[in-house]
Amino acid sequence: MSIIITDLCKTFDDNEVLKNVNITLKDNSIYCLMGTSGIGKTTLLRILMGLEHADSGSISGIDIKSVSCMFQENRLIPDLSAIDNVRIVLRGKPNRQEIRNNLLSILPDDSLDMPVNSLSGGMKRRVALARALS
């Protein structure tokens, strides 16, 4: 299934950030958004994630609830453990042991229950990635 973006427009005040954007994103493909500051890259992603609404246009072939992203900044909750930072984004009653087992493939066991603010930068990044993929 593809994500089809048709004639998408978004304006902030009098600044037209997205103007008639048309893109087809094919399933199981990797894409990269590149461009100068202020061109609308983040706005487009925020619209795809349901965090922002377009002024006009349409997006089809996507269930907003299934979209996740990894921010440039980690956006972790510093006082929570790696496990709890992943757990907080999961719906329902996530199984703590299952999260622990999944995290063990990317983090040492003794770091899983530590507050993420005590982890190295690389470890924090791995927690952020695990959360985005959850």
Question: Where are each of the predicted segments found?
Answer:
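Conserved structural motif at the start of ABC-family nucleotide-binding domains
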Residues: 3, 18-20
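The feature captures the beta-strand-to-loop junction immediately N-terminal to the Walker
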Residues: 34-36
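Helix-to-loop junction immediately C-terminal to a conserved catalytic motif
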Residues: 49
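Conserved catalytic motifs of ABC-family nucleotide-binding domains
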Residues: 74-84, 88
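Conserved ABC ATPase "signature" region
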Residues: 96-112
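Conserved ABC ATPase signature
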Residues: 115-119, 123
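Hydrophobic anchor residue at the start of the ABC signature
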Residues: 129
